[in-house]
Every structure is written in structure tokens, then in C-alpha cells.
Amino acid sequence: MNVVILGCGRTGARLALELSSKGHGVTLIERNPDSLRRLGKTDGFNIVIGNGLDIDVIERAKVAEADAFFAVTRGDNTNIMAAQIVQRMNKTAKVCVKVADPERAKAYRDMGMFCINASSLLAGLCRDWLLNEPYETIDKYNVLSKELEI
């Protein structure tokens, strides 16, 4: 499988290493070349340095040929905008977006994007671990986010 990952922070680097170790082709889009140090050596990865919202950068990453695209930068807006661009360029790719704001995650899920909200996922796993309950599917954890009213 050919995968494009936008962002080489902790999540992007870990995902790249995991997928590469399973024999998948991985292309990383990253603005800051220093972030690539998280990979150790970059052999075996296709690296595109640039802004992941720039069409030229996205085209150089060959998203039109990718089987999957992950937008995992620290910025919700960047992740969502990049995912929308990729969805238009490649109708068949699986697109996953890391979103910190649970309200945004729900809105973009309703648009057909697979969104991961890390705080909801972690909270659900911790709850089930503590209560000795069986673990749920990722979709169950992703929608946990009920905000507290103060």
C-alpha cells in the first residue's frame, strides 16, 4: 500500500515507522526538515519538504496515486483543509484526519472523513481499563466527547 502522511511529529513519525516496517510505501510531507530526525534515518521514506496545503507539494507527494492519506499535524485547520484537497484529488484514497477539537471532529465525520480525536480515544480506553470493561471499536471512543458545562 502507498501511504502519504502530512506531519512528521510524534504521531506522523510513529505511523510512518509502523507502516514502513510492514512493507508499505510511505511518503512524508513536512515543513520543518528538523522534524525528520524522529524517524532516525530517512532511508526507505519518500520525503517532500513543504507546506501540506500547497497543491504543488501535495502533487509532488503523489497523493493522486496513494491508497491512504493521513493528516496528523498539530493544526486542526491544516489537517482538515489538506484532507479536503486530497479527497478532491483522489476519490479512492482512505483519508484519516487527526482533530483535537471534538466538535470539529463530529462535523468533519459527517462530511465523510475518518477523524481521530486523541483525547476521546484515550479517555475511553482509560475508562474501560479502569472498570475492567471490554475495549470498544475506535468509532465508539471517537464520539465520547461530551463537554462539561461550567
Model-derived features: positions:
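Cytosolic regulatory regions of ion transport systems
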Residues: 1-150
